[in-house]
């Protein structure tokens, strides 16, 4: 049996699609699964148990990347094609079943929308990541707080200085995670965005995990953390999918669509709503700076405490 799974370019959207992929992999354990995704997200799927092939979709002018993907896939007859990009590809290939993501609904979380593609919108499978077996000694003591201070757009980016203050509070001897180490995650290309965080932390208090490896490596390191706090980003969704207690910071993005998914997740947002932020006079996403200034360190620390208390109460 052959399954073609066409998913997102962006890491966060690709992570959110892993729930339905995991469902298909479990339902058809002997299937050969081919995953097509953008270069930023493709390594998420390297450890998928049923994986047959990965196809990197490098964006090309005039949509030529779709022609390239068709050429890669046309010689096979697919039992199932799942297209989460709403392209015409599925209708140009031989397939037993075709599942195309429906149009987005305003109030539907992305996980629910993705699940509705294969008829599971009422009971959406949670995103999941597949960790490689490791021979490393993972018995090191002490707690770790994962901090992800970058974002794919400056408007969504809380200031690195505030992240540093928050990290200091959470890891203080009397903090929520007393004497925890700070694990800082970002892509290597984002180092300049997060440098101010390093500049404001004691040098012996953190692990610099910027650009540490591909996304499978990052997932392994994230899974060893006790708590995650970061902007609305792919790393936030990875942490949630790994079952790490996850607090997402939101401003100019919709929590109803992209809040971290799972029982150990929460979010805190600016006092201004998404509509108030993007509807403000003079707003232009191309030229704006950070739109997260209305979110205070006090508010984020309080949200972290509330999330930890809620998780502890529910266990």
Show where each model-derived region lies.
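Catalytic machinery of carbohydrate-active enzymes
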Residues: 1-315
């Amino acid at each position: 049996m052959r399954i073609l799974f066409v998913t997102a370019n962006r890491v966060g959207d690709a992570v959110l699609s892993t729930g339905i992929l995991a469902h298909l992999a479990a339902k058809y354990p002997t299937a050969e699964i081919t995953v097509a995704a953008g270069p930023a997200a493709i390594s998420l799927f390297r450890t998928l148990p049923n994986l047959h092939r990965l196809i990197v979709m490098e964006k090309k002018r005039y949509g030529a990347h779709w022609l390239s993907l068709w050429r890669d896939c046309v010689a096979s007859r697919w039992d199932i094609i799942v297209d989460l990009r709403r392209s015409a590809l599925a209708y140009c290939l031989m397939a037993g079943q075709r599942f195309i993501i429906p149009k987005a609904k305003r109030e539907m979380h992305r996980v629910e929308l993705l699940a509705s593609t294969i008829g599971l919108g009422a009971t959406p499978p949670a995103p999941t990541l597949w960790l490689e077996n490791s021979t490393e000694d993972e018995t090191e003591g002490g707690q770790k707080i994962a901090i992800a201070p970058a974002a794919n757009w400056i408007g969504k980016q809380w200031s690195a200085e505030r992240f540093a203050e928050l990290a200091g509070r959470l890891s203080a001897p009397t903090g929520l995670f007393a004497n925890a180490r700070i694990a800082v995650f970002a892509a290597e290309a984002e180092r300049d965005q997060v440098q101010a965080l390093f500049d404001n932390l004691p040098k012996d208090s953190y692990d610099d995990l910027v650009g540490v490896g591909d996304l499978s490596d990052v997932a392994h390191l994230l899974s060893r953390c006790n708590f995650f706090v970061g902007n609305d980003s792919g790393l936030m969704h990875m942490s949630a999918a790994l079952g790490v207690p996850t607090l997402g910071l939101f401003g100019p993005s919709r929590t109803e669509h992209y809040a971290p998914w799972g029982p150990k997740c929460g979010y805190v947002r600016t006092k201004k709503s998404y509509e108030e932020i993007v509807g403000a006079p003079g707003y232009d996403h191309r030229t704006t700076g950070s739109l997260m200034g209305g979110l205070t360190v006090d508010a984020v620390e309080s949200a972290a405490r509330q999330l930890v208390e809620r998780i502890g109460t529910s266990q």
